[in-house]
């Protein structure tokens, strides 16, 4: 056990570095970082197990930060670990720095998740805890004996997502999840008492958490709480640590600057900064220093960790020799490579809804991909993720041998937990709900896109053909929103999200194959509620791999090109016979993914959608959904929704809203006559 004075000195060292980073950048959040320094120091210098020489070791404990604005605390602690240099943290919030304002996924530097939007980080941590339990059930305790640590703030507790995480983690009994709640009673605009009057401990106890309340700035109490959390074998643990915002901060006039809203989101300021650094034992002229006793503290921990890791790796080697088949599976699962799937085993029925076609694909994935988890937000029998569920069973407290995650009605929680499963490694995650409820998931979709996490988002009931449920449940603008993400690149130059909306059952199989092959970005799969007619005989569905392609039966040298995705492709086909009877040569293009199409060679794009040929687009979403393919101007026309939907049987809505072959004929004839 390390000397308390050394531990307190190390925490003060973190405070000095954190405050100095913010001061130098003239931007950031020093107060919370200073309050949380004691906990992060105890965790990193005495409890967190990791390999100092291999940050990617699968057996490592994971630490997930939820309040990304507390990055100065995390960067400072990681600097003491040796993962960042002093020069690195001096460049906090600057162009090209490895220390951005909010942490971004960087496992080599010890950062397990991008964080910032409050609440999502601890949902990600809960997902990682599920992944560890899932893998333990398949590989055993030797390979999966690590813990998931998470750090949350008052803001995360206030966010609605905390309800979902609290409920799910408690229900599943995630005893490998240890969460520290930095309860400093201060937020950006007010003290928390002005906006939150609740018994948080009682709330989490009601969710069946092990709740421990401590002084979060007291080393002995932090240690005792962590020991208790590690010993817990039935429940997730919440350590509520009462901390002091801006601990150790001193104003320019020499009075205390602790417990002040002003230190939350702004530099301390010249006089206060100088007095604070002096008060904490640092030199304002040379603040970016690691104290000698703190260097020794972390050097000793590194040596201790080398011994711990060596012993663990010896256990792992012995396990691998005794379980060569499982070792091979584990290597495959953690490789990040796409799984091998025999798609020929998927037998599709003609004319079914694409959600049913997706169900057939999911059934095979459940059989062929043993490290895949599928989830649904209380809609498995409707979004047809039950195709997967029928081949396995749901995850339950004490039984993680199943592979289906019933998240309940909590779309954002589900999405972020699936991200966490994949960030943990070894697991492929997919999650489903109605397309209109993708709105609840947008923050998670954005984080997955930013981090390049290849979660599979399954969205069904894709248009006004939801029918009788009416406009609250009928997506109109959602497709345009998600397809915009295909136009946004991540920092690696990839389309941030890959979107597929297949035209029939067989095209669905190809889209699912591409989704499983996509290991670099999230994939959105958009499926219909209603049955869809099969595309013309002889259609080459493998051409869907190019994002957009010419449907079988199209005419050479067309007078007009008809473009759509999803069920609207068959509606276009329904209008073609009458157009051809009038002597009009027609090409039909199915475009399940505009983003993928725009990644094709220019020659292919021009061959499918030649610039000088008139184009007519049909979409059950906003007209702008197809503007990137059909264009705008006199040679282009798009027929789409101008309002929200209505409540009526979907076939009635098709007639009333003009989504029929007859109206396609009428619209195209009128378009060509001008």
Predicted regions: what is each one?
Residues 277-308:
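Non-catalytic, alpha-helical, charged scaffold/linker segments
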Residues 155-161:
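Short acidic, Gly/Ser-rich segments with clustered Asp/Glu that frequently serve as metal-coordination loops
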Residues 149, 373, 561-563:
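Conserved beta-strand elements of the Class I
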């Amino acid at each position: 056990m390390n000397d308390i004075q050394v531990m307190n000195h190390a925490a003060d060292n973190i405070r000095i570095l954190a405050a100095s980073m913010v001061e130098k950048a003239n931007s950031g959040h020093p107060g919370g970082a200073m309050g949380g320094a004691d906990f992060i120091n105890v965790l990193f210098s005495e409890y967190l197990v990791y390999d100092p020489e291999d940050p990617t070791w699968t057996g490592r404990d994971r630490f997930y930060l939820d309040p990304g604005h507390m990055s100065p605390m995390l960067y400072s602690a990681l600097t003491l670990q040796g993962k960042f240099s002093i020069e690195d943290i001096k460049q906090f919030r600057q162009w090209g720095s490895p220390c951005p304002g909010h942490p971004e996924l960087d496992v080599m530097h010890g950062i397990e998740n991008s964080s910032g939007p409050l609440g999502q980080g601890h949902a990600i941590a809960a997902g990682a805890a599920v992944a560890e339990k899932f893998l333990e059930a398949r590989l055993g305790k030797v390979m999966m004996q690590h813990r998931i640590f998470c750090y949350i703030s008052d803001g995360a507790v206030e966010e609605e997502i905390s309800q979902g995480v609290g409920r799910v983690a408690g229900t599943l009994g995630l005893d490998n999840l240890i969460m520290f709640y930095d309860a400093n009673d201060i937020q950006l605009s007010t003290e928390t008492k002005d906006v939150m009057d609740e018994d948080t401990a009682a709330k989490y106890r009601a969710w069946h958490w092990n709740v421990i309340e401590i002084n979060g700035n007291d080393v002995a109490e932090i240690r005792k709480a962590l020991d208790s959390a590690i010993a817990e074998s039935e429940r997730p643990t919440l350590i509520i640590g009462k901390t002091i915002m801006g601990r150790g901060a001193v104003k320019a006039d020499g009075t205390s600057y602790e417990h002040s809203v002003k230190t939350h989101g702004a530099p301390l300021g010249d006089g206060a900064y100088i007095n604070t650094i002096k008060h904490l034992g640092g030199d304002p002229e040379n603040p970016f220093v690691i104290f000698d006793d703190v260097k020794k503290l972390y050097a000793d921990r590194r040596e201790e960790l080398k011994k711990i890791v060596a012993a663990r790796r010896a256990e792992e080697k012995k396990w691998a020799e005794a379980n060569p088949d499982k070792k091979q599976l584990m290597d495959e699962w953690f490789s990040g490579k796409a799984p091998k799937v025999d798609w020929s085993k998927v037998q599709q029925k003609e004319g079914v809804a694409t959600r049913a076609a997706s169900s057939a694909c999911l059934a095979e994935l459940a059989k062929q991909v043993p490290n895949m988890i599928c989830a649904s937000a209380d809609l498995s029998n409707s979004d047809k993720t039950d195709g997967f569920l029928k081949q396995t069973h749901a995850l339950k407290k004490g039984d993680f041998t199943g592979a289906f995650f019933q998240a309940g009605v909590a779309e954002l929680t589900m999405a972020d937990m699936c991200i966490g499963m994949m960030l943990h490694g070894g697991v492929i995650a997919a999650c489903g709900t109605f397309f209109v409820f993708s709105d609840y998931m947008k923050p998670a979709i954005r984080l997955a896109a930013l981090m390049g996490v290849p979660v599979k988002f399954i969205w069904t009931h894709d248009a006004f053909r939801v029918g009788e449920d009416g406009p609250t449940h009928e997506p109109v603008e959602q497709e345009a929103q998600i397809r915009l993400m295909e136009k946004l690149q991540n920092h690696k130059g990839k389309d941030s999200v890959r979107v597929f909306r297949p035209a029939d059952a067989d095209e669905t199989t190809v889209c699912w194959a591409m989704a499983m092959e996509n290991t670099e970005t999230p994939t959105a799969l958009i499926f219909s509620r209603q049955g869809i007619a099969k595309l013309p005989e002889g259609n080459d569905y493998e051409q869907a791999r190019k994002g957009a392609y010419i449907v079988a039966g199209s005419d050479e040298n067309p007078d007009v090109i008809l473009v759509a995705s999803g069920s609207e492709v068959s509606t276009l086909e329904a209008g073609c016979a009458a157009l051809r009877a009038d002597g009009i040569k027609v090409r039909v293009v199915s475009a399940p993914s505009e983003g993928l199409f725009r990644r094709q060679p220019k020659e292919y794009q021009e061959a499918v959608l030649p610039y000088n040929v008139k184009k007519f687009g049909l979409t059950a979403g906003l007209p702008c959904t197809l503007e990137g393919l059909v264009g705008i101007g006199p040679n282009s026309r798009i027929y789409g929704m101008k309002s929200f939907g209505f409540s009526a049987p979907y076939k009635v809505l098709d007639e009333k809203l003009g989504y029929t072959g007859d109206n396609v004929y009428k619209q195209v004839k009128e378009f060509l006559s001008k």
